């Protein structure tokens, strides 16, 4: 699952 940058 691709997570957006923090």
From Swiss-Prot:
Domain of life: Eukaryota
Cellular localisation: Secreted
Keywords: Cytolysis, Secreted
One GO location term (cellular component): extracellular region
Disulphides: none
Gene Ontology process terms (BP): killing of cells of another organism
Tissue and organ distribution: Expressed by the venom gland.
Protein role: May act to induce hypotension. Presents moderate hemolytic activity at physiological concentrations (micromolar range), and weak lactate dehydrogenase (LDH) release from mast cells. Does not induce mast cell degranulation, and antimicrobial effects. In vivo, injection into mice induces increase in nociceptive sensibility and causes moderate edema formation. It also reduces locomotion, suggesting an increase in anxiety, but causes no alteration in rearing (standing on hind limbs).
Name this protein carries in UniProt: Cryptide Pep-11
Organism: Tityus obscurus (Amazonian scorpion)
């Amino acid at each position: 699952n691709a997570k957006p940058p923090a």
